[in-house]
Amino acid sequence: MTLWVLGLNHQTAPVDLRERAAFAGDALPRALESLRALPQVSEAALLSTCNRTELYAMADEAHSLVNWLETHAPGLSGHLYQHREAEAVRHLFRVATGLDSMVLGEPQILGQVKDAWAVARAHGALGSGLDRLFQQTFSVAKRARTDTRVGANPVSVASTAVRLAQDSFARLNESTVLLIGAGETIELAAKHLSEGRVRRLLIANRTLAHAQTLASQHGGFALPLTDLERHLAEADVVFSATAAREPLVTRAQVEQALRTRKRKPMLLFDLAVPRDIEASVGELGDAYLYTVDDLERAVEDNRRGRREAADQAEAIIDLQVARYVETLQATARQAPLKRLRAFGDSTRDELLAKARQQLHNGKPADEVLEQLAHALTNRLLHPPTAALRNAALNNDLELTTAADRLFPEKPGYQHPPIATPIVRTDDADPAP
């Protein structure tokens, strides 16, 4: 099986395509079950955020994975990137560290990667290969953030949106802000808004208790989602980030809110994928709509400022990828030896048990030992003998040369011992 990653993100696909590719809520476990049903796939995990959808899999080939994604959301293939083996490892390390994010070094992505791992594990989609990869990913991301400043003064999509709102409304502290949702992105927005203070903070969510908890933490007022339309006109600024499959805020609702506000401008930030606010709202004269794609341009300065720290993090990742691949290769080299030893042990145990039974039945010991020796020799030498016979017929010089080294003609000759590979398990840099 080969390690593959296939995906699309904010760099390769626009928001309308990303929202079609997203897996939200109950769709994620069902998708994992569907993936694991493919005969070419032994392990799988799905990472789905507002900026990316990625499929990690141990699979025979990538074609079946592309077809599966195309079935989920037709039209993706022209926007997909694909990595295998070492490059797939590097990609996941970079994603979890925040080096592949719209906001360079953003801290939320590591939690989202952990969530993807936890869901895949809970639904039986992970095996030892992907589980080991994700565990190493968490370790590498932690080290990169600890040893560099790539995560210093963390900037998120939510904080970038709040900063834009502050720049747009000189007196945001005199404005009413409406938050739709109660997930991590909205929690971050509420935190940044409460630090800068706003006149009134409204929080609407499908589960009222979640909105009430968030409101109590940040001095806001909780609303059931069913009251959203009634309170929309009160909002000068709207932030929305839910997992809804259909828009929660329509053009007609915003038009009505603007009439009620006597055309006083509204600023709306749609931080969700799929989108929470109908795209046509941005066509209204007094409504200013920003999506996650629009925010990419706003965070470019942040990306430049973190480039030096990112370069340091890339160096850490390069080293850790090399070590991880070295460990996998060492394990793979040991596999044939383990199979050979297991074959020898099982053959010995089987024939020895048979010989003991013969002795127990009164058969002469010399006869039993003679039969045991012949049977053991024949059983152990049959596979290599058959393989060498086929190699001679097919002119397989590689195998016959290896046999010459294993079984030299000169009696008593011994090859030098084969050194056991040293597999590094610590994170320390190699000694100079």
From Swiss-Prot:
* InterPro entries in the record: 4pyrrol_synth_GluRdtase, 4pyrrol_synth_GluRdtase_dimer, 4pyrrol_synth_GluRdtase_N, GluRdtase_CS, GluRdtase_dimer_dom_sf, GluRdtase_N_sf, NAD(P)-bd_dom_sf, Shikm_DH/Glu-tRNA_Rdtase
State the reactions this protein catalyses. (S)-4-amino-5-oxopentanoate + tRNA(Glu) + NADP(+) = L-glutamyl-tRNA(Glu) + NADPH + H(+)
What Pfam family is a match for this entry?
GlutR_dimer
EC number per UniProt: 1.2.1.70
Q: Where is this site: Important for activity?
A: H91
Q: Which UniProt keywords apply?
A: NADP, Oxidoreductase, Porphyrin biosynthesis
Cite the binding residues for substrate.
T49, C50, N51, R52, S101, E106, P107, Q108, Q112
**Active-site residues?**
C50 (nucleophile)
Residue ranges of the region described as Disordered: 409-432
Q: Which GO terms describe its molecular function?
A: glutamyl-tRNA reductase activity; NADP binding
Signal peptide interval: none
Q: Does the keyword Glycosyltransferase apply?
A: no
Subunit relationships: Homodimer.
Q: Which family does it belong to?
A: Belongs to the glutamyl-tRNA reductase family.
Q: In its UniProt entry, what is this protein called?
A: Glutamyl-tRNA reductase
Q: Which gene encodes it?
A: hemA
